[in-house]
Each structure stands twice: as C-alpha cells, then as structure tokens.
UniProtKB/Swiss-Prot annotation:
Binding residue positions for Zn(2+): C130, C133, C150, D153
Function of the protein: Catalyzes the reversible transfer of the terminal phosphate group between ATP and AMP. Plays an important role in cellular energy homeostasis and in adenine nucleotide metabolism.
Protein encoded by which gene: adk
Residues reported to bind AMP: T31, R36, H57, L58, V59, G85, F86, P87, R88, Q92, R160, R171
Location(s) in or outside the cell: Cytoplasm
Subunit structure and binding partners: Monomer.
Keywords: ATP-binding, Cytoplasm, Kinase, Metal-binding, Nucleotide biosynthesis, Nucleotide-binding, Transferase, Zinc
Name of the protein in question: Adenylate kinase
Binding site for ATP: G10, A11, G12, K13, G14, T15, R127, S136, Y137, Q199
MF terms (GO), sorted A to Z: adenylate kinase activity; ATP binding; zinc ion binding
Listed Gene3D superfamilies: P-loop containing nucleotide triphosphate hydrolases
Uppermost EC category: transferase
Length: 214
C-alpha cells in the first residue's frame, strides 16, 4: 500500500501519519528524514544535496527524486510506504509517478486532511509558553486555568514569534498556494481523497483506516 499524505500545517498530519504506519506496518517517509539519512550515510546523492544546502540553494528536483527513489527501493518499503512532505510541486508529482512505476508499483492513495483556514490559524496561534518553567499551553486543547498565567508557577505566558498571527497567516497562505496545484493534479487522476480534519482525532483516523481498507 503506497500512500501520499497531504495536509496544511496544523491539520494534524503528523498525528495521523504515526497511526497509519503503525496500523499498516509501513515506513513513514518524510523528506527531512530522507535528506538527513542520505547526507549522514554520505551517499553520492546525499553529498550532492548537501553541496546545494550548504550554499543555501534549493536542491534540484532530479537530486530529490534520486534520493526518493533510493529510499523507496529499500527492503522496508516492500509492503508499501507513507510519503509525507513530498511531492511539493506538480513536476515532482509527475517524476514520482514515473519513479514508482519504474519500481513496478503505483501510488494507491493520496489522502488530504482538510481543515478550513480559519480553524488552522486558531490551532497554530493557540500555543503559549511559560518563560519560567517552559510549560506549554494551548488555548483550544490545553488552556491554563487563568488566561495568560502558568498553572505551575504563575509565570506570564508568552507567544513565540513563529506562532504569532501575522507569521502563521503568511506561512499558511504560501502553503495553500503551493498545495492547490497538487490537489488539482491528484484529483484529475482520481486518486485524491479529502478527509475532514476538523473532527476528533479518533474519528479522522477511523475514516482514513476505512478508506485504506476499502
């Protein structure tokens, strides 16, 4: 079972990825992990990727695809895989389709965990941290007893720069613009399945499981 998992920041993709790979006994393959492993193992493609990254340049698609191909060729992918964070563009998606085909396989499912923009903003801007003890709170999921104050030591909670609404909104809008062409691409291939990510975590996973077993 070969799966691509899509979802914007805050959609709960990481949580569902963990559950899927455990349920179906397939490896969770993220681009970050792939790159780190290739660089650490000093594979020719890993070293080539590192030379671009060291200069602050984007790694060319052909190198990225080469690293993906190496990873998908490993023994632990024999029963399938879950790809997370790749592809990011339509050319990468086309190259991935060709690569998987060359390996005698195909992409079976593309799952998009769908959450409305306003809900994502609320999720992503809800984290507040205590400067004294480092405790983390969330206004939606784990609020302090008194707003803005740490339960443990009374420290005044603060918000990281990355969690502020201006930064979150900009990051989300960039992601939405990048993701839409991929959604269109996989929709046209009749591979894409939208899952409502605004439901309870257990319900989201139950729907994904039902889809994959169907």
């Amino acid at each position: 079972m070969n799966i691509i998992l899509m979802g914007l920041p805050g959609a709960g993709k990481g949580t569902q990825a963990e559950r899927i790979v455990k349920e179906f006994d397939i490896p969770h393959i993220s681009t970050g992990d792939m790159f780190r492993a290739a660089v650490k193992n000093e594979t020719p493609l890993g070293l080539e990727a590192k030379s671009y990254m060291d200069k602050g340049h984007l790694v060319p698609d052909e190198v990225v695809i080469g690293i993906v191909r190496e990873r998908l060729s490993m023994d632990d992918c024999a029963k399938g895989f879950l790809l997370d964070g790749f592809p990011r563009t339509v050319p990468q998606a086309e190259a991935l389709t060709a690569t998987v085909k060359e390996l005698g396989r195909e992409i079976d499912h593309v799952i998009n965990i769908n959450v409305q923009r306003e809900q994502l903003i609320e999720r992503l801007t809800g984290r507040w941290i205590c400067p004294v003890c480092g405790a983390s709170y969330h206004t939606m999921f784990n609020p302090p007893k008194e707003a803005g104050v740490c339960d443990k030591d009374g420290g005044k909670l603060y918000q990281r720069e990355d969690d502020k609404i201006e930064v979150v909104t900009q990051r989300l809008d960039v992601n939405i613009a990048q993701t839409q062409p991929l959604i269109d691409y996989y929709s046209a291939q009749e591979l894409l399945r939208d899952i409502d990510g605004e439901q309870d975590i257990q319900v989201v996973f139950a729907e994904i499981k039902s889809l994959l077993r169907g």
